[in-house]
C-alpha cells in the first residue's frame, strides 16, 4: 500500500460523503494504528489529522500502546489538538493478556499510554473483550465487571466486545470441539447492572454531569450461535435492550427482560467452580430451546 493509494482512498471517501457533511464523527481504523510510522506515511497521517480538524469533525483513530509516545503526541496535536484514540486493551489483567489473548503488552503499558493521552487532552476509548478463550462464563462475568471498574475513570468510552467465533481461528477450533461457548447475553446484562454505579455514580444516564465514562456494547452476531446468545427465544429482545442501554446509559432500558433460560445460565455459573470442564458447550449450548441446533 503506497502513500498514493492511501491519499486516493481518503479523497474518494471525502468526495463520496461530501466532506463528511452530515457526519459528526470520522473513524479512521487501520486495524492497528494510524500513528504507525512504518506502515502509514507521515504525510498521510498529517492529512487525516488536519482535514478532520479543518472540517470540525470528531476524529477517532486506533493505536497500540507502543505507538503512543510523548514525541508522537506532541507532533499529532500540532495538526489536530482534539481527537480520540481507541486502544484495544482487551483485559485489565496481565495474566489474561498473556495467556488468553496473547496481546503483546502489559496493563502498565496501557496505563502509561493513557497518562500521555490525558496530558495532551486527548480522549481515550478503551476496548475490552468479554469471555476471551479458555475462560468460563462465571469467570468472564467476574473479570468483565472488574475490568470495567478498573478502566472507567481513565476512559471516556469503554467498548466491551463479547467474543464471537470467526472461522479459521483458534477459538473456532475450540468451538467446534465443544470446548468453548460464546457468552450469554444475560451475562452482558448482568455486567451492565453491576457496573452502572461506577459509570453513573448518581444513577444518571449518558450526558449527565455524574457520568464517569460511557459503556458501549454492540454484540457482533448477537443472538446467533457464533455470537453472544441465549436460548434463541429471547435473544432479539435482550440484544435490543443492550443496544438501547449503550445509547442511553439508562437502566430502565433493561427492565422487563425475562426468560426461563436465565435459570440455565445461573446453574451453569454456580457449577463452574466444581466441574472440570465449563458447562454451556456442545449441541445444548443455547439452553432450553433449539437443542438440536447444529454448528454453522
Model-predicted regions and their roles:
Residues 38-46, 69-78, 138:
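Distinct, well-ordered alpha-helical segments
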Residues 2-14, 40-50, 105-111, 140-148, ...:
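Well-ordered, non-membrane alpha-helical segments in soluble/globular domains
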Residues 1-40, 51-68, 82-110, 157-159:
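Core AdoMet radical
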Residues 108-169, 189-219:
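Conserved C-terminal portion of the radical SAM core fold
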Residues 32-34, 65-67, 91-93, 130-134, ...:
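Active-site-proximal loop/turn and secondary-structure-junction residues that shape catalytic pockets
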Residues 15-21, 48-54, 74-82, 115-119, ...:
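Acidic (Asp/Glu)-rich catalytic clusters
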Residues 81-83, 142-159, 236-259:
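Structural recognition of alpha->loop->beta junctions
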Residues 165-296:
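Auxiliary Fe-S-binding modules of radical SAM enzymes
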Amino acid at each position: 500500500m503506497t502513500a498514493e493509494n492511501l491519499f486516493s482512498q481518503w479523497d474518494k471517501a471525502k468526495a463520496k460523503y461530501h466532506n463528511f457533511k452530515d457526519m459528526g464523527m470520522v473513524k479512521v481504523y487501520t486495524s492497528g494504528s494510524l500513528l504507525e510510522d512504518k506502515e502509514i506515511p507521515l504525510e498521510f497521517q498529517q492529512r487525516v489529522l488536519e482535514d478532520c480538524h479543518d472540517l470540525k469533525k470528531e476524529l477517532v483513530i486506533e493505536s497500540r500502546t507502543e505507538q503512543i509516545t510523548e514525541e508522537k503526541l506532541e507532533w499529532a496535536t500540532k495538526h489536530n489538538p482534539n481527537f480520540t484514540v481507541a486502544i484495544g486493551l482487551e483485559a485489565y489483567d496481565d495474566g489474561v493478556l498473556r495467556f488468553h489473548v496473547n496481546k503483546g503488552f502489559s496493563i502498565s503499558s496501557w496505563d502509561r499510554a493513557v497518562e500521555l493521552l490525558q496530558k495532551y487532552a486527548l480522549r481515550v476509548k478503551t476496548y475490552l473483550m468479554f469471555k476471551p478463550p479458555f475462560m468460563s462464563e462465571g469467570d468472564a462475568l467476574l473479570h468483565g465487571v472488574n475490568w470495567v471498574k478498573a478502566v472507567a475513570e481513565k476512559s471516556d468510552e469503554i467498548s466491551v466486545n463479547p467474543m464471537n467465533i470467526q472461522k479459521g481461528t483458534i477459538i473456532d477450533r475450540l468451538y467446534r470441539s465443544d470446548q468453548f461457548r460464546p457468552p450469554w447475553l444475560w451475562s452482558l446484562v448482568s455486567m451492565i447492572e453491576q457496573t452502572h454505579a461506577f459509570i453513573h455514580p448518581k444513577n444518571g444516564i449518558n450526558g449527565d454531569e455524574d457520568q464517569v465514562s460511557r459503556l458501549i456494547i454492540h454484540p457482533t452476531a448477537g443472538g446467533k450461535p457464533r455470537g453472544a446468545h441465549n436460548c434463541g427465544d429471547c435473544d432479539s429482545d435482550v440484544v435490543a435492550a443492550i443496544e438501547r442501554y449503550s445509547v442511553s446509559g439508562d437502566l430502565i432500558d433493561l427492565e422487563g427482560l425475562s426468560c426461563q433460560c436465565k435459570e440455565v445460565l445461573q446453574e451453569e455459573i454456580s457449577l463452574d467452580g466444581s466441574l472440570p470442564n465449563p458447562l454451556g458447550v456442545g449441541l445444548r449450548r443455547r439452553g432450553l430451546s433449539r437443542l438440536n441446533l447444529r454448528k454453522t
